[in-house]
Amino acid sequence: MDPDEVNQALGHYLNDSESGELVVEDSTTVQVTNPEARKTGDKIEVYYSRKTTVVSPTNSDDEEGEFCSDSELLPAQGGHRSRATSFAGRVRAGSDDEMNPKHTVLRYRRKKGGQWREVNAQGTPDKRKDDEDELEVDVKEDRSEQTGIVTKTYEARWKVLKYEHLPEWLQDNEFLRHGHRPPLPSFAECFKSIWSLHTETGNIWTHLIGCVAFFLLACWFLTRPDNHIQFQEKVVFSFFFAGAVSVSDSRSPSTPSRVIRSTSSRYSANSTIWESRCSLSARLFQPKITYIAMVCVLGIGAIVVSLWDKFSESKYRPVRAAVFVGMGCSGVIPTIHYIITDGVHSLFADNSFHWLLLMAFLYLLGAALYATRTPERFFPGKCDIWFQSHQLFHTCVVIAAFVHYYGISEMAFARLNEQCPVR
């Protein structure tokens, strides 16, 4: 079925109107995500929205109507199973409370090669675990009892998709089999998807929770009295909080993955700069500036690589992880410098280096899980929603950021209390 046939089918099922009703407005929006389907014969995906405004007699004796599916929601034609949806809905007025707006959500599911069936919100997982697709239809009616004007809105869309049904640019992990969020037509739809359950839900919320937590921590830290935390320390720490909040908030529903990687690179560079600044702050000016400049150059290089479209492909996932790890490992050089000048004991006793080691371990662990796609590689289809590698990577990064904050705050307070020697 090509896009023209989809439009015709959708119009056929929704063009019925009540006798005596005068149609004032009837607008339909159909967005086809694969316009080349008529040439290639591939499956297509359709986002369908229709708004109908009619004037009906206010003294009508119509009875409450029903919602029905769309002729089994367009079964296969021409040997290709269609990805398009339509919905035949008819709402009739008659009761006293129908002047209030109505909102009904209907859900349909189907197994592979099967017909669509209507399900309720309490459908048991056992009956739904083998389903291939879920279709969600929003039906809204706004009726004015005084004017007789009725506005009906129908919106049909897929809630989740299988991996094979995603466009190529979203096929990043073939071990996540079901529950993918489809391409959405607007930012509003992307934002609403925060509250739905799909493969990106855990990725979104691990970052959003971290963002809120760091924002609250920043508010507490920056509002401390100056006799506890001096103003210049607040200014310097504000850069750390800005980096932590930005990397935590970078997983909005519409954020491209390359922007996320560039934000992670900025945060990694920020971490190393803080190590150099706090551990060498009482030392000669030149080495500290040299290390900070070195990290800035490496960070810019990592951001450039992260924003390069070529590295957005799934096959470069290990390369992306290696860039992230390499950026973090740049902190080894100032650490070796400190060991040479002050020894290992001072590194741990005066600079809380054990916390920075824990931070590095969490970074490496998260990057390794992300690069190897563990554990979903060993359990395909079992980690589609929870405990997938990307979620674990985000969790490791957020925890590492809190560990990093604690470590550098200990280093900063030790410097303020003049516990580190000046040379």
Swiss-Prot record:
Membrane topology designation: Multi-pass membrane protein
Family named by the database record: Belongs to the ADIPOR family.
Any one GO cellular component localisation term in the record: plasma membrane
Compositionally biased region (Acidic residues): 60-69
Positions on the Cytoplasmic side per record topology: 1-201, 253-288, 342-351, 414-423
This protein's name: Progestin and adipoQ receptor-like protein 1
MF-aspect GO terms: signaling receptor activity
UniProt-annotated location(s): Membrane
Species, as recorded: Caenorhabditis briggsae
Top-level taxonomy: Eukaryota, Metazoa, Ecdysozoa, Nematoda, Chromadorea
Top-level division of the source organism's lineage: Eukaryota
